[in-house]
């Protein structure tokens, strides 16, 4: 076929064409049309009749009229469509790459058209045809995809329950037929939206609602089967899928055991726990303990329920942890009496990574014993348990045991060198061999109803002399009223010289994040042994005298075995607060809620008797419950001064030691932590000293330095010095300020300034309120600007002795005075001081700062500014705030 005929078959010349181009176009066009009715990928044969395309390519179109056969091509030349000659596609069309993703067949046609459109007649109509063919091809494929998706969803709607429902039903449901009974099968078939089988079983009686039995014999459903675990056993009670499943040793043998089982949060939990009124929970982590809403009464009715709820424990480490002993799986399956499951602790104590700093003492009692969370209480079985119907939490609802996870830096661990932690496993040459506190009681009990009962530190008939700090005998196990028959006698199995009773426990705890061990000496072996054996008593100890002392009582200084007063810089966690009151222990009154606080870091550091290692305390501002205990057991607390303010037990500023340390000399060791002698605080970022060398906190020290007055506890603004900007108004400001003085609202004894006229000897010597500066220290020029307020004076130019008071003496008493008095007292003191200065040769005197401390009335060494210091330091104190 070498050309095309005219549209009507009339006369006219035949337009020469390119046969190869039309032949390829014919193949592509006809193939695309045939592809709309068939899905064959084979190329179709060439059609015998090509007349169906004659209308599209004839010259009978309006673009090419039939009578213009000689020169009809001028309309389609370069002047109108220059891009057809070049062969470039028009702007706005999709490129071949984009069309290749949509339809490969349409892409072939587009490539054919883009190459041959410059030589084709009727290019616009050919372009329209091409786009319509591509649109039909795309729509046809979309219809086929939609039909396939509808057929697949129709097949899945009549299949068995979904994978989510299989988790709540007995296992192996995917391989079993889906028809249980006629009613259930009709429901599944009729309702295509029924994708799950939800069994809502009341937790009160789960055995009364058995699940439907499944029968075999039908084909496997088309749903996606969920492979059940090999070790999973069919059970009658459903367990929600969101319950955590701790790592188990059996999972290592499963097919996908290396993949952690993700805890799913599905609608099953919301529906199943809606009747129980449990709020929607967050999705728990893999190892987080989940408290299932079941109780002991339910387990009595349905023993299989305990097998359905997964085991859990806070001490449960990974099953893939390295156990360096072969019997770790045997001696770690300790089943507690209060727990319904056989909890496996997975050998946490033998983990080589966590116990790098020493074996973890699971029952070491360094927490308050009256807390309900404590498990090491020896009298836990004697207490009444909280019933199930109580509004409080109790252990009848399964609570996990205490957390035994190690911390890398903040958990105090016994600093042992070896890896073995049992009692008699390996002998060691080193004196710091392994000592371990025994597990007295290894179960959790509910102490809620009995935790508020009073406890007594000592037996009321016991003598105090058995419990001094340096006594060699101490009872290392909790105080049982009778000797324990199951106790091992350490003298029969151990070397008597192996353990030292009076050993210091300074290096027993090493704080992981504390690296300031620069002051530790090398003597850390023989006298730094760890925990001694329980019951390692000497012959002087009385075992039959009842409960001598309660080892777990917070505030007892015998809570650590072999406790002595010598401590190093290591952190000691535990109830090691010394009972330093001198009264008798057998007091009738006791504290009901004795949740005592443990000793702080500063108390341990300040018990060191070496004066070279005296350090400034760093304490925590916790409520001082140990001070409350001392006040309840002490009615005759001795104070340094009768005006010393009493101690309050709930204030964070109250020291957990004596009321005030008192004046200490240079070589004297203080008996407690550093305490501010003004406000009695122990928590300050910086410690300062007054002129007498006594410690002040940062607030009191700065106040004394800036204002020249000891900081009052009830702060008044009249003691704060304001700058005198000019000399003109200084006298008026000082006068008005002197008239506003009032007595200090403080519990400290008020002491007035002793004037020089009270004693003739004091006028020429150092007195309490008047000091003589060095000669030449004060300028003798007459027009001195008064620093502080002075009484109203006459004209200062007069040279008479009675009128030269304002110029010959610089009165600094109202500014620099520690204790404020009435304005009349200040004026009288100023007049007497000026008279004394006139009688002693006109030398100016300065009424100076007298920062005596609260116990200054009983300490005569505090009556001066600097008792043994020179006048240069005195003048420095006088002028440091100018």
Curated annotation (Swiss-Prot):
A zinc finger (GATA-type) spans 676-700. One of its GO terms (molecular function) is DNA-binding transcription factor activity, RNA polymerase II-specific. It comes from the Eukaryota. Keywords: Activator, DNA-binding, Metal-binding, Nitrate assimilation, Nucleus, Transcription, Transcription regulation, Zinc, Zinc-finger. PROSITE patterns: GATA_ZN_FINGER_1, GATA_ZN_FINGER_2. Signal peptide: none annotated. GO terms for cellular component: nucleus. Its main location: nucleus. SUPFAM superfamilies: Glucocorticoid receptor-like (DNA-binding domain). Residues 1-13 have a biased composition (Gly residues). Residues 156-169, 177-191, 394-413, 492-503, 617-642, 795-811 have a biased composition (Polar residues). Residues 604-613 have a biased composition (Basic and acidic residues). Gene3D superfamilies: Erythroid Transcription Factor GATA-1, subunit A. Residues 1-75, 139-191, 228-257, 325-344, 394-422, 461-545, 579-675, 723-871 are annotated as: Disordered. Transmembrane segments: none annotated. Residues 325-334 have a biased composition (Basic residues). Residues 48-59, 745-759, 848-861 have a biased composition (Low complexity). One of its GO terms (biological process) is nitrate assimilation. It is found in: Nucleus. InterPro entries: AreA_GATA (IPR013860), AreA_N (IPR011420), Transcription_factor_GATA (IPR039355), Znf_GATA (IPR000679), Znf_NHR/GATA (IPR013088). Major nitrogen regulatory protein. Positively acting regulatory gene of nitrogen metabolite repression. PANTHER family: BOX A-BINDING FACTOR-RELATED (PTHR10071:SF281), TRANSCRIPTION FACTOR GATA FAMILY MEMBER (PTHR10071). This is Nitrogen regulatory protein areA. The lineage of its organism: Eukaryota, Fungi, Dikarya, Ascomycota, Pezizomycotina.
């Amino acid at each position: 076929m070498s050309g095309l005929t005219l549209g009507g078959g009339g006369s006219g010349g035949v337009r020469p064409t390119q046969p190869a181009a039309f032949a390829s176009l014919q193949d592509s066009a006809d193939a695309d049309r045939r592809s709309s009715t068939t899905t064959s990928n084979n190329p179709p044969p060439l059609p015998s009749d090509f007349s169906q395309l004659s209308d599209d390519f004839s010259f009978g179109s309006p673009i090419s009229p039939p009578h213009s056969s000689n020169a009809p091509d001028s309309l389609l030349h370069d002047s109108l469509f220059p891009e057809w000659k070049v062969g470039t596609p028009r702007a706005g069309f999709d490129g071949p790459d984009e069309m290749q993703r949509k339809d490969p067949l349409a892409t072939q046609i587009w490539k054919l058209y883009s190459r041959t459109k410059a030589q084709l007649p009727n290019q616009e109509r050919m372009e329209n045809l091409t786009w319509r063919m591509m649109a039909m091809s795309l729509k046809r494929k979309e219809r086929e995809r939609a039909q396939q998706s509808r057929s697949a969803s129709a097949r899945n709607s009549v299949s068995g329950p979904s994978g989510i429902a299989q988790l709540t039903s007995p296992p192996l449901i995917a391989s079993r037929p889906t028809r249980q009974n006629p009613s259930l099968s009709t429901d599944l078939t009729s309702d295509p939206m029924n994708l799950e089988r939800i069994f809502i079983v009341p937790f009160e009686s789960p055995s009364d609602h058995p699940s439907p039995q499944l029968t075999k014999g039908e084909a496997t459903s088309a749903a996606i089967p969920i492979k059940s675990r090999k070790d999973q056993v069919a059970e009658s009670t459903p367990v929600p899928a969101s319950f955590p499943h701790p790592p188990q040793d059996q999972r290592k043998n499963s097919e996908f055991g290396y993949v952690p089982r993700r805890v799913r949060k599905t609608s099953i939990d919301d529906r199943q726990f809606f009747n129980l009124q449990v709020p929607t929970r967050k999705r728990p982590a893999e190892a987080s303990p989940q408290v299932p809403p079941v109780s002991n009464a339910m387990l009595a009715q349905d023993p299989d329920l305990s097998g359905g709820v997964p085991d859990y424990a806070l001490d449960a480490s990974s099953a893939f942890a390295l156990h360096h002993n072969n019997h770790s799986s045997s001696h770690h399956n300790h089943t507690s009496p209060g727990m319904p499951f056989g909890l496996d602790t997975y050998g946490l104590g033998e983990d080589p990574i966590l116990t790098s700093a020493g074996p973890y003492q699971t029952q070491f009692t360094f927490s308050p014993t009256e807390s309900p969370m404590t498990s090491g209480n020896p009298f836990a079985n004697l207490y009444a348990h909280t019933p199930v119907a109580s509004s409080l939490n109790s252990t009848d609802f399964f609570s996990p045991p205490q957390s035994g996870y190690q911390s890398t830096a903040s958990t105090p661990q016994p600093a042992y060198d070896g890896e073995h932690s049992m009692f008699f496993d390996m002998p060691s040459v080193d004196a710091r061999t392994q000592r371990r506190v025994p597990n007295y009681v290894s179960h959790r009990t509910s102490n809620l109803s009995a935790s508020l009962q009073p406890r007594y530190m000592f037996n009321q008939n016991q003598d105090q002399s058995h419990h001094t700090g340096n006594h060699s005998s101490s009872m290392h196990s909790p105080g049982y009223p009778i000797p324990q028959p199951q106790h091992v006698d350490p003298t029969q199995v151990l070397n008597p010289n192996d353990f030292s009773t009076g050993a210091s426990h300074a290096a027993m705890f090493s704080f992981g994040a504390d690296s300031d061990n620069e002051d530790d000496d090398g003597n850390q072996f023989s006298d730094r042994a760890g925990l001694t054996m329980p019951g390692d008593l000497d012959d002087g100890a009385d075992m039959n005298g009842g409960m001598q002392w309660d080892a777990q009582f917070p505030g007892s200084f015998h809570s650590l075995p072999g406790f002595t007063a010598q401590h190093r810089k290591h952190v000691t966690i535990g109830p090691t607060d010394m009972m330093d009151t001198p009264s008798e222990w057998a007091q009738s009154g006791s504290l009901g809620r004795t949740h005592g606080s443990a000793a702080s870091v500063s108390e341990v550091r300040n018990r060191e008797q070496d004066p070279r290692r005296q350090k400034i305390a760093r304490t925590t501002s916790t409520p001082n419950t140990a001070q409350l205990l001392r006040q309840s057991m002490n009615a005759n607390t001795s104070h340094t001064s009768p005006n010393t303010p009493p101690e309050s037990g709930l204030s964070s500023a109250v020291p957990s030691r004596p009321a005030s340390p008192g004046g200490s000399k240079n070589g004297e060791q203080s008996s407690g932590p550093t305490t501010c002698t003004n406000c009695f605080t122990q928590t300050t970022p910086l410690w300062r000293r007054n002129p007498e060398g006594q410690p002040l906190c940062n607030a009191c020290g700065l106040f004394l330095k800036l204002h020249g007055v000891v900081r009052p506890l009830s702060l008044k603004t009249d003691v704060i010095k304001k700058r005198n900007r000019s000399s003109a108004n200084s006298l008026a400001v000082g006068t008005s300020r002197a008239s506003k003085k009032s007595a200090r609202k403080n519990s400290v004894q008020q002491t007035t300034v002793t004037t020089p006229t009270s004693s003739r000897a004091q006028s020429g010597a150092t007195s309490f309120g008047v000091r003589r500066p060095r000669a030449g220290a004060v300028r003798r020029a007459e027009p001195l600007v008064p620093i502080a307020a002075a009484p109203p004076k006459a004209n200062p130019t007069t040279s008479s002795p009675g009128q030269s008071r304002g110029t010959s003496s610089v009165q600094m008493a109202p500014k620099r005075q520690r204790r404020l008095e009435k304005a009349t007292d200040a004026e009288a003191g100023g007049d007497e001081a000026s008279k004394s200065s006139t009688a002693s040769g006109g030398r100016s005197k300065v009424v100076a700062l007298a920062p005596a401390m609260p116990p200054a009335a009983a300490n005569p060494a505090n009556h001066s500014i600097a008792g043994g210091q020179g006048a240069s330091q005195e003048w420095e104190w006088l002028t440091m705030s100018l």
